[in-house]
Amino acid sequence: MATIRACRPDDLDALHEICLKTSDNGADGTRLYQDPRIIGEIYAAPYAILEPAHAFVAEDADGVAGYILGAPDTRAFEARCEAEWWPTLRQRYADTADVPSWKRTRDQWDAFHIHHPPPVPQPVVDAAPAHLHIDLLPRLQGRGVGKALMDRWLATVGGRAHLGCQAANPRAQRFYERYGWRRLEGVGPKSVVWMTFGA
């Protein structure tokens, strides 16, 4: 069984690996990227570094294989990333705004995100200001670890939050719905399913 514990600075490489290996709608996205760390620089590392009180990992005998990361105030987190996180990455990754969207690779889409991070839609933040990201490697899936991580994290924000799930990832949507998350209909692009808990 996995142990749930607070994230530590030395977990950062594991967070990057997990983020990459779940980046293809829950499956291993390694083949989709030239830079294996770029996606983690968006969806994992900033939370571990800027919001350590809201970062937890699941660790088994083979190491860290899951995480839940987030922020209690989405707008404050977006502002902090703009001030403290994105500037350094913008020096490392060139803006790809000049590449037509239909031609962009995964790396180019993520570089575009770094330069033009989309704010969470206001109706989502109004429903629940906190947000999270949760990912588990296959060896921890279906064993109650996701629920344990969710329980631990939601307790840190008073049990109210939102998340965005890829519409092409029905397995994740089923997990959230079983836990008690509800869909917010008619918000944002159809490629993302916005969900809230406790709202």
Language model region names:
Residues 75-133:
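Conserved acyl-donor/pantetheine-binding loop and adjacent beta-alpha core of acyl/acetyltransferases
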Residues 125-127, 134-151, 167-174, 178:
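Conserved glycine-rich acetyl-CoA-binding loop
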Residues 3-17:
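A short beta-loop-alpha structural element at the N-terminal edge
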Residues 57, 63-72:
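Conserved beta-strand in the GNAT
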Residues 128-130, 157-167:
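Conserved GNAT acetyl-CoA-binding A-motif
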Residues 74-75, 164, 177-196:
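Conserved catalytic-core motifs of GNAT/GCN5-like acyltransferases
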Residues 32-55, 61:
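Active-site rim helix/loop that mediates acceptor-substrate recognition in acyltransferases
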Residues 23-43, 79-94, 98:
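Conserved GNAT-fold acetyl-CoA-binding loop/helix
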